Swiss-Prot record:
It is an enzyme of class 7 (translocase). Disulfide bonds: none annotated. Residues 2-241 form the ABC transporter domain. It comes from Escherichia coli O6:K15:H31 (strain 536 / UPEC). This is Methionine import ATP-binding protein MetN. Pfam families: ABC_tran, NIL.
Length: 343
């Protein structure tokens, strides 16, 4: 449905040249939810704006539904853009128009008959859960409701593709979850292809089928969500995955934790499990093999793309030789082990 090939985008600011994208290629199959994740300034927004040519690539090819957009005339491009809806971090609603009027706007601009506009807008507001807000104004809506109006407006022309530019980053966590569930529901009901960009791995984990990691204008990793969470290939992907798990050292342990070993101490370990290592009984196996005992302090597990992953804080009791051997064995079995200190 979306195929970007060798996209390069260069900006010129006076005598300065800024390369925002460098030889980026990306394929989003029809009906998928595809996420692009990266830090601020990585090139995410430039990339998604190249899909509908809000930013025209310096080099490269942009195919949407089999049509090469970079070769179209302005009138042809305007027509093609009707098949590409877009929502943004800021909702960009017209404050002087009601909810109905905001959603109706693209249909009015397309000279759609009034009866058809009424039918379509009513249908869309019902779809996004705002069937009772026809006559409300944006100033009377919450942030989540405003984004629902923006989604309905983006769907007004029956697009085949929806682009989401940091669409949930201005929302609180509960509202973010509800908007993501709405996007997932729309994807299922309408077969809509969704390309979203974000700096939050929680967004990717919750609704995406595939994910690409962007850094300094280059895609450094892309695969299914389950594969990236199971076997992240780059340090940046690992960092984003770790950001979805939050496990603090309990206060009483922080007070006792020492950086260097001392008499009768035990190491405190942070264990990170991904993919196959999650379900394998590795801790009980280390106890049998190396005569060590693990006292689990706290743990957190989660799912992404059907794959379980998680982290654990544990004290490992045993001789220095046995604990070192057990740690090495865990690492051989795809567990990331960090010695946080000694207690």
């Amino acid at each position: 449905m979306i195929k970007l090939s060798n996209i390069t985008k260069v900006f010129h600011q006076g005598t300065r040249t800024i390369q925002a994208l460098n030889n980026v290629s990306l394929h989003v199959p029809a009906g998928q939810i595809y996420g692009v994740i990266g830090a601020s300034g990585a090139g995410k927004s430039t990339l998604i704006r190249c899909v509908n040519l809000l930013e025209r690539p310096t080099e490269g090819s942009v195919l949407v539904d089999g049509q090469e957009l970079t070769t179209l005339s302005e009138s042809e491009l305007t027509k093609a853009r009707r098949q590409i809806g877009m929502i943004f971090q800021h909702f960009n609603l017209l404050s002087s128009r009601t909810v109905f009027g905001n959603v109706a706007l693209p249909l009015e601009l397309d000279n759609t008959p009034k009866d058809e506009i009424k039918r379509r807008v009513t249908e869309l507001l019902s779809l996004v859960g705002l069937g009772d807000k026809h006559d409300s104004y944006p100033s009377n809506l919450s942030g989540g409701q405003k984004q629902r109006v923006a989604i309905a407006r983006a769907l007004a022309s029956n697009p085949k593709v929806l682009l989401c530019d940091e669409a949930t980053s201005a929302l609180d966590p509960a509202t973010t979850r509800s908007i993501l569930e709405l996007l997932k529901d729309i994807n299922r009901r309408l077969g809509l292809t969704i390309l979203l960009i974000t700096h939050e791995m929680d967004v990717v984990k919750r609704i995406c089928d595939c994910v690409a990691v962007i850094s300094n204008g280059e895609l450094i990793e892309q695969d299914t969500v389950s594969e990236v969470f199971s076997h992240p290939k780059t340090p940046l992907a690992q960092k984003f995955i770790q950001s979805t798990l939050h496990l603090d050292i309990p206060e009483d342990y922080q007070e006792r934790l020492q950086a260097e070993p001392f008499a009768d101490c035990v190491p405190m370990l942070r264990l990170e499990f991904t993919g196959q290592s999650v379900d394998a009984p590795l801790l009980s196996e280390t106890a049998r093999r190396f005569n060590v005992n693990n006292n689990i302090i706290s743990a957190q597990m989660d799912y992404a793309g059907g794959v379980k992953f998680g982290i654990m804080l544990t004290e490992m009791h045993g001789t220095q030789q046995d604990t070192q051997a057990a740690i090495a064995w865990l690492q051989e079995h795809h567990v990331k082990v960090e010695v946080l200190g000694y207690v």
